Amino acid sequence: MKLTCVLIVAVLFLTACQLTTAASYARSEREHPDLGSSDQNSKLTKRCLASGETCWRDTSCCSFSCTNNVCF
């Protein structure tokens, strides 16, 4: 009987922890929607740099050619 009560209390406690964590996570998503969205970081939404623009690596240029930090 005591073990059953302890198990029930433990399950209720863990359920409450799960619900409060989920609620705070959802609130954080609403406060900072850009942190949860990976659309801006995906390759489909990234734009490439045109010729003459400042670059830092070859893959950021449309031509895939970055020399002396300038796209060619």
From Swiss-Prot:
Alphabetic keyword roster: Cleavage on pair of basic residues, Disulfide bond, Knottin, Neurotoxin, Secreted, Signal, Toxin
Chief place of localization: secreted
Coiled coil: none
Propiece residue ranges: 23-45
Cellular component annotations (GO), alphabetically ordered: extracellular region
Signal peptide: 1-22
One MF annotation (Gene Ontology) recorded for this entry: toxin activity
Superkingdom as given in the UniProt entry: Eukaryota
Disulfide bonds: 48-62, 55-66, 61-71
Region span, Disordered: 25-44
Subcellular location: Secreted
Tissue expression summary: Expressed by the venom duct.
Entry similarity comment: Belongs to the conotoxin O1 superfamily.
This protein's domain notes: The presence of a 'disulfide through disulfide knot' structurally defines this protein as a knottin.
Name recorded for this polypeptide: Conotoxin VnMKLT2-021
